[in-house]
């Protein structure tokens, strides 16, 4: 047996210079599946500031809330990723555990006294518009994984449920039924709600409690009031 193998090997060596070498094409495949790295407005964690400016304490009504209906505070949020992905997010309220006597539903993100953040002094809401994926028109849709309270609008930000950039407008659907769009650049304009509610999805607008309600919390407006609020959007790649 060994002699036979040796003979074949020698024959192959002797014959090699005589045979024409066949061309070879190597069809190689390279790929990489891993979570993408994304930035929000150019940073891994970005603070998007909505500045309502300064108003006089005299504008706050004695027994009714003060509504910021005359201003338009808005910002563009851009999420850029280094690989194609689906993108969803969930909104939470940093000061959501503070007590608020009015408009205490899912769309309201609490505003608190900066010097005493245990005291809620009002609330803000947000709506979005002009959603895009890779520069093409898209929608932001809401899943029904978390029940919302208050009126249901298509483009209002609520605390709890999953949202995602989709190819069609969807509301209150199973999270696995969201028609998510894959892309690398996700963008939307966020602004505070409009004081005049309508069927297009505008909500009631940012507000400050009345002087009477603030007084119950030990807040004297004659000394001025600095307030803060924070809606946190936590992004995820898919549902």
Regions found by a protein language model. Give the residues of each.
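Mature extracellular/passenger domains of Gram-negative fimbrial/pilin and adhesin proteins
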Residues: 20-239
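Gram-negative bacterial Sec-dependent N-terminal signal peptides
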Residues: 1-21
């Amino acid at each position: 047996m060994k002699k036979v193998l040796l003979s074949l090997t020698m024959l192959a060596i002797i014959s090699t210079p005589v045979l024409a070498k066949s061309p070879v094409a190597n069809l190689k495949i390279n790929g990489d599946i891993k979570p993408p790295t994304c930035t929000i407005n150019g940073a891994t964690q970005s603070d998007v500031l909505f500045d309502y400016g300064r108003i006089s304490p005299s504008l706050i009504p004695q027994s009714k809330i003060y509504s910021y209906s005359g201003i338009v505070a808005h910002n563009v949020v851009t999420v850029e990723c280094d690989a194609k992905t689906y993108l969803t997010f969930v909104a939470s309220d940093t000061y959501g555990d503070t007590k608020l006597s009015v408009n205490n539903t899912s769309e309201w993100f609490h505003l608190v006294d900066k010097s005493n953040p245990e005291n809620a002094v009002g609330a803000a809401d947000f709506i979005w518009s002009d959603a895009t994926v890779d520069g093409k028109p898209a929608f932001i849709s809401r899943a029904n994984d978390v029940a919302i309270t208050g009126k249901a609008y298509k483009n209002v930000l609520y605390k709890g449920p999953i949202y995602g950039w989709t190819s069609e407008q969807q509301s209150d659907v199973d999270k696995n039924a969201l028609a998510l769009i894959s892309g690398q650049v996700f963008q939307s304009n966020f602004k505070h709600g409009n004081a005049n509610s309508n069927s297009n999805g505008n909500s009631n607008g940012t507000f400050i409690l009345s002087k009477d309600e603030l007084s119950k919390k030990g807040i004297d407006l004659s000394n001025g009031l600095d307030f803060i609020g924070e809606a946190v959007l936590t992004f995820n790649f898919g549902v």
